[in-house]
A protein has these predicted regions:
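Acidic, low-complexity intrinsically disordered regions
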Residues: 1-218
Length: 218
């Protein structure tokens, strides 16, 4: 789990990025108990435990930097676990990466090409069981078009938000063995569908993560 805003960081206060990747068992024991909460946090929660600090995300969207760090983590993992199930990278975003270089032809625009190239490099990282899979889910408080697992970029070209196309290009094509199982999560995905939801609602958000982390996909 990595957070990114003005910086890329571990949202788990007890586990620094330098210790990633981490096991589920380590994550399970890394919570902060109610005795460790600040007075402000105590006023805002009814839970006696907390795993994720959500208040550290602010400002920019340093997606390029985040994916650069994730690539190194995935590479290190695959070297140590060549026979494991391929890594799955799930990215939650509310908009366009803004740590990209300026477009050489239009200085008012950002150039997403370095991010596309980086994602393609990540997708090529593989174990003996297959390649890394990248999924993207976009969230917004603006009412707009909901797009689930588009097969063609034509399905999102009418969306004015440039992040719609960027996230499409970043996403992996859903592996064929996953398609039939997708119906069990309420998704009807055609062959060639991208592992990507734009302007997700809450139900789709939950199903996206259950689908993407389902152990029966292995």
């Amino acid at each position: 789990i990595l957070g990114y805003g003005d910086r890329v960081f571990s949202p788990i206060s007890k586990i620094p990025v330098s210790e990633y990747p981490i096991s589920v068992n380590k994550l399970d024991s890394s919570y902060e108990s109610v005795e460790e909460f600040s007075e402000e946090e105590l006023d805002e929660t009814n839970s006696p435990l907390k795993w994720i600090n959500s208040d550290s995300v602010s400002g920019n969207t340093a997606m390029l930097n985040a994916f650069t760090k994730v690539k190194k983590i995935i590479e290190d993992w695959v070297k140590k676990h060549p026979d494991s199930y391929p890594p799955i990278l799930l990215n939650i975003s509310d908009g366009m990466a803004n740590d990209l270089p300026r477009d050489e032809e239009d200085n008012d625009k950002l150039d997403p090409l370095p991010l596309f190239e980086l994602c393609n490099e990540i997708k090529k990282i593989q174990t003996n069981d297959g390649n890394t899979v990248i999924g993207n889910i976009h969230l917004s408080d603006v009412v707009g078009k909901l797009v689930k697992f588009p097969v063609s970029i034509d399905e999102i070209l009418d969306i004015e938000d440039p992040a719609a196309v960027t996230l499409f290009e970043m996403s992996s094509t859903i592996p064929a063995p996953w398609l039939e199982k997708a119906q069990g999560f309420g998704f009807n995905i055609g062959p060639g569908g991208k592992f990507y939801i734009y302007n997700s609602d809450f139900d789709s958000f939950l199903s996206f993560f259950k689908f993407g982390t389902d152990p029966t996909n292995a």
